């Protein structure tokens, strides 16, 4: 499995996980020139912007460690555009990271990651 396939698989796992928790998926791979958000979901009255990180092992660190300051800044920029475009200015939001551990077949959901 190449990195793209691992990422796509991890995103499917994350979507299914969020659905099982009662979330509604609003967008997948929401892209602008400045960046991308893997999943935008709604749970109750809150909009959740989710970055998914998949790993076969932790040889190069935990998945969440790869969400750098620069990456967070891009995600926040894309989220800001989404909020304005969809008139969600008064809606509570949060930024989550979902780590998918492929070999262990488990996930770790970090709510309010940044």
Swiss-Prot record:
**TM helices/strands, residue ranges:** none
Q: Which GO terms fall under molecular function for this chain's record?
A: nucleic acid binding
Q: Which Gene3D superfamilies match?
A: 3.40.1350.10
PANTHER family according to UniProt: UPF0102 PROTEIN YRAN (PTHR34039:SF1)
By sequence similarity, the record places it as follows: Belongs to the UPF0102 family.
Q: What is this protein called?
A: UPF0102 protein CD630_12710
Q: Which organism is it from?
A: Clostridioides difficile (strain 630)
């Amino acid at each position: 499995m190449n990195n793209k396939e691992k990422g796509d698989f991890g995103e499917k796992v994350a979507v299914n996980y969020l659905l099982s928790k009662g979330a509604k998926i609003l967008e997948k791979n929401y892209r602008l020139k400045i960046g991308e958000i893997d999943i935008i979901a709604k749970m109750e009255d809150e909009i959740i912007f989710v970055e998914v990180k998949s790993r076969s092992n932790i040889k190069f660190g935990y998945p969440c460690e790869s969400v750098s300051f620069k990456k967070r800044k891009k995600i926040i920029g894309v989220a800001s555009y989404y909020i304005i475009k969809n008139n969600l200015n008064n809606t509570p939001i949060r930024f989550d990271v979902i780590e998918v551990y492929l070999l262990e077949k488990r996930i770790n959901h970090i709510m309010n990651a940044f």
